[in-house]
Regions:
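Acidic, contiguous segments within the catalytic cores of piggyBac-derived transposases
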Residues: 1-448
């Protein structure tokens, strides 16, 4: 991350001109930056500047003590994960919509499967990363709490919500799909768990007779709701209209059992992991589905308690913060189930674990050169003037003014505002930044 951030900052400055407020970052600083974003999700404030406010009602000394606000915003401006100078175009066969974050996504998904082996029961469902900006694979889900955003398919352990694999949905594939989207999602995302006797639970969006048959061939068993008109279902199930509560109709073919059951409304299930139901009350497939389908919802719930990262225009950053947040949720699950560590102390919950993760990422890092008490004294000292011939740089007695050189070079703050300075050239009566702009402005004018 540090290498690519420095590379991107250099590439941008080749286009827009030198940035006097930027200096190369390091791995330690980027870890601290991530830790600050994690902590901001715990201590949520409405504006980014609030964390550095001197007003005790807003300010957060822990976050503001790591680095100045200007440095944090500079890292926000230039953070990058991959060199995009060689990114394939949309017409290229190698085009990947997730090119900017692909290495991170692949690395993290492999780590999820390596560090923890899930139990038998897994649920497959969709999650949403809230995003209202511009990206061609943004989705609208009116029935979801988060209606606009990027859709992510997840397979999670039913009991704990541990996410073992995920895949970002980037829209329709060229050439279409042979068996449909639902089939492809479940088959591809559960490949690492084939031939391991897992039981999968998913809803009717994914469910089909063909998918259940193919998963059964790789010793992976399913239970889920299914649309009554799906191809391959028995005609009796497809046409069933149950009238009384508790009424049940079952049809079996090999390991596959199709069940139609009337509760408050008529439900249809397809299962290869259950035995035919012969008792009273709700059938086994219904009970197991209700018990094991909520794995993805558990993971989502833990992730939304403490969101990581701030809102912005760049879609890929939402995926970065999603991965970091999901990693913390998974890490907490692994910690609580670990046999190597002693039993967690009373009160050491997800919140306490998350705060410790943020603190260890920061690990005492600070890029501040002066203590807070000394900064006030330094601000009142007379700044030594800089000179170039008869041109002299001095401090403006009143409020700051827009830097002439920054304006010419079209530099802006991360929020798009003009850059202001507290210094000006006495001879030219031109406001100029102390670091770089004073010399650059006069050198350019002398050359012309």
């Amino acid at each position: 991350m540090a290498i690519e951030t420095n590379r991107y900052a250099e590439q941008r400055q080749q286009v827009t001109g030198p940035d006097p407020r930027w200096r190369p970052t390091t791995a330690d600083e980027m870890r601290a930056y991530v830790g600050m974003n994690v902590m901001m999700g715990v201590k949520q404030l409405p504006r980014i500047w609030c964390y550095w406010s001197t007003d005790k009602r807003y300010g957060d000394p822990f976050i503001s003590g790591v680095m100045p606000k200007t440095r944090f915003l500079k890292l926000n401006q230039y953070i990058h994960l991959r060199d995009t100078s060689d990114m394939p175009g949309r017409d290229d066969p190698d085009y990947d919509p997730l090119y900017k974050v692909r290495p991170l996504l692949d690395l993290v998904s492999k780590k999820f499967r390596k560090v923890y082996k899930p139990a038998r029961d897994l649920s497959v469902d969709e999650a949403m990363i809230g995003f209202k900006g511009r990206v061609h694979f943004r989705q609208y889900m009116p029935a979801k709490p988060t209606k606009w955003g990027v859709k992510v398919w997840e397979v999670c352990e039913s009991d704990t919500g541990y996410c073992s694999n995920f895949d970002v949905y980037t829209g329709r594939k060229p050439g279409g799909r042979q068996h449909g989207l639902g089939y492809d999602v479940v088959w591809n995302i559960t490949k690492p768990f084939h031939n391991k006797n897992h039981h999968l639970y998913y809803d009717r969006f994914f469910s089909s007779v063909l998918l259940a048959e193919h998963l059964d061939m790789v010793s992976t068993y399913v239970c889920g709701t299914i649309m009554q008109n799906r191809k391959g279902l028995p005609a009796e199930i497809a046409s069933a209209k149950l009238k009384n509560n508790g009424e049940l109709l079952q049809m079996q073919k090999g390991n596959m059992i199709a069940t139609s059951y009337k509760d408050k409304r008529q439900l249809t299930f397809l299962s290869t992991s259950q035995q035919p139901f012969q008792g009273q009350g709700k059938p086994t497939c219904n009970l197991n589905y209700n018990s094991h389908m909520g794995g993805v919802d558990k993971s989502d719930q833990m992730r939304t308690y403490y969101p990581v990262g701030r809102a912005g225009k760049k879609w890929w950053r939402y995926l970065l913060w999603f991965v970091i947040n999901l990693s913390i949720v998974n890490a907490h699950i692994v910690y609580t189930k670990s046999e190597k560590d002693p039993a967690p102390k009373k009160g050491y919950d997800h919140l306490a674990f998350r705060v410790d993760v943020a603190e260890q990422l920061i690990a005492g890092y600070t890029c501040r050169k002066h203590k807070a008490g000394k900064r006030v004294a330094l601000a009142n000292q007379v700044v030594a003037p800089e000179t170039i011939g008869h041109h002299k740089l001095e401090k403006i007695s009143g409020r700051k003014k827009i830097c002439k050189e920054c304006s010419v070079q079209k530099r802006r703050t991360p929020k798009g505002r003009h850059i202001e300075t507290s210094f000006f050239c006495v001879f030219c009566d031109v406001p100029l930044c102390r670091n770089g702009c004073f010399a650059a402005y006069h050198h350019r004018n002398m050359m012309t």
